[in-house]
Structures are given as structure tokens and as C-alpha cells.
Amino acid sequence: MVNPVIFEFIGTSIHNQLNNYVTMVASNTMNMIATTAVLAGGLYYTAMGILMSVGRIEGPFSQLVISCIKFMLIAAFALNISTYSEWVIDTVHNMESGFADAFAGNHGTPSSTIYQTLDNSLGKGWNIAAMLFEKGDNRGLTQIVQGFSELLLSFLVAGSTLILAGPTGAMIVATNAVIAILLGIGPLFILALGWAPTRGFFDRWFGAIVTSILQVALLSAVLSISSAIFSRMVAAINLASATQSTLFSCLSLTAVTIVMPYMMYKVYEYGGILGSSISAATISLGSLAVNTATSGGGAMTSIFSGSSGGGGSGSAKAGGESSYSAGGNAMWSPAYRQHVLGQFNRD
């Protein structure tokens, strides 16, 4: 019996190397951007606070405090390797395994053993090829035609099996490598969430990771289907039967093997399309949330600054804008206060 461990050995070796690579690159990226991020963030929020206090910038002070707290939380994820590994790297790997399990169905193979599944499919086909080769090799001179046919069929089955498992393993290994590279440089893109002009970088980085996860999950689903079909067709080949056409069974197996890689290629392509749409939806939802919050804040400001205070508000308005503002019915505006004080200091 042939029990190959080709893909399992390659996949496990690459997976271990990629895990070390992610940790090393993420740590180096954090060390590179930590000083710049702390200095830039500190200077930015210090300058914004000073400008707001002297009236050069209008806006509620609470918004600046909330923005500063949000930046510190983002920095805690982007500049600490243990937090990043636990909350980001492990989460992405769990998403990959979860999507692969869900898309593969009840009898699907988890993504952690997908390389073993490839080896099992490869071993089943090669076992049939080995039996065909042995049977053809044992033919005598009087059965040279049958022996030659079985030898040819053995090579046909072995090649078809490799064509089925090879591209799938290559695409999964390549996609996992892409995920590892994206996770390695992830701290830079997570830190980009701290400033509005650079938030789009995080959306595109997250979209690329989701695209890779969907591609692995969809490949797992197709692999589960193709492995079931392949195993059933291989089990139907009975070399000892005098009535079954071995040639027809092998040709059917070859036809299925040609169709399945094309299906995997199309599924891989559609995974990229779905991931791109999720990325675009993330950006749109982020913009929608910002616009909604801005509109809601403006509406609440109008409500609290326009009608609170009852009848006293009308008399305050009649007395002038300065007394109305002093009554506590409007938000604190340093620029407006400076303008009012300037009116009193005029000659």
C-alpha cells in the first residue's frame, strides 16, 4: 500500500516556517514604527488640544478625548506582540479554520488536516496505479497486449491523481503564505486606523485577508467534493472482474480529474471576487457610520442649543447672543468667545 506524506510534509514545514515568519516580521514592524507612532500621536493630540483651547479650532473637547482614547486602544493592538498574536493572528487563523469547516460540509476535512486529505487522495489513486502496474508486469508473452494496456492505465491513473491533488495543494500553500505575509505587516495597517486619512489602508489590508480566507475555504469545499467523487470512482474499479471494463473506468476517472482542477480554479477566482466585495462593503459601512454619527451629532447639537431653557431662551435671545450663550444653552465655542471678547475691547 502506498501512503504518501508529500503534501503533509510540505504543508507542515511551510506552516511552521510561516508562523515563525509572522512573529518575527510583526515584531520587527512594531519596533520600526513604535517610536514614530508614539511621537506623532503625542504631538498631534497635544497640538489639537492647544489649538482648541486658544480658539483656533472649533469643536467639543470630549470628541478630542474620545479620539485620543481610541488611538491608545489601537496602539495597544498594533504595538504589542503578545496582544497582536492573541487577538489578531489567532483570530485570523480561527476564521480560516472555521470558514473551511463550514464550507466543507458535515463530512468535510478541517483546514488543519487539509494536507493529509491531499495525501490520502493521492495514495488511493497511486494504490490503484500500483496494482495495475503489478498486474500488467505479471502478464506473460501470450498476454502482452493486456499487460501493455494495464501498464499504460497505471501511468494514466497515477498522472490523473497527481493532477487532481497538485494544483489544490499549490493554491492552498500559496494562499497561506499570502496570509502570513499580510499578518506580518499587519501592525502598520492596524495603526493606520488612528487617523482618518489612512483608515482606507486598513480596509484594503483586511479585505486582502478576507479574500485569502475565502479562497482557502472554497478550495476546501471543492476538495471535499472532489475527494468523495474520486474515492467512489476508484473504489468502483475491480481489477479481478472479468465483465467490468477497466479502460472505461480509468477514462472516466481521467475525465473527472480534468474537470475538477478547472472547478478549483474557478472557485479560487470567485473567492477573490467575493473578498473584494466584502472589502468594498467594509469601506462603505465605515463611511456610512461616520456620516450617520456626524449627522446625529449635528441634530443633537441643534436640539440642545435651540430649544432648551423654555421661555427663558427667548428672553435670552432678546438680550443678545452673549447673554444667551452665557445662559448655558449653547456648546462651548472658543472662537465665538474670542469674537465676543473682541467686541468689548473695541474702542
From Swiss-Prot:
It is a multi-pass membrane protein. This is Type IV secretion system protein VirB6. The keyword GTP-binding does not apply. Keywords: Cell inner membrane, Cell membrane, Membrane, Transmembrane, Transmembrane helix, Virulence. It is found in: Cell inner membrane. One of its GO terms (biological process) is protein secretion by the type IV secretion system. Transcription of the operon is maximal in early exponential phase.
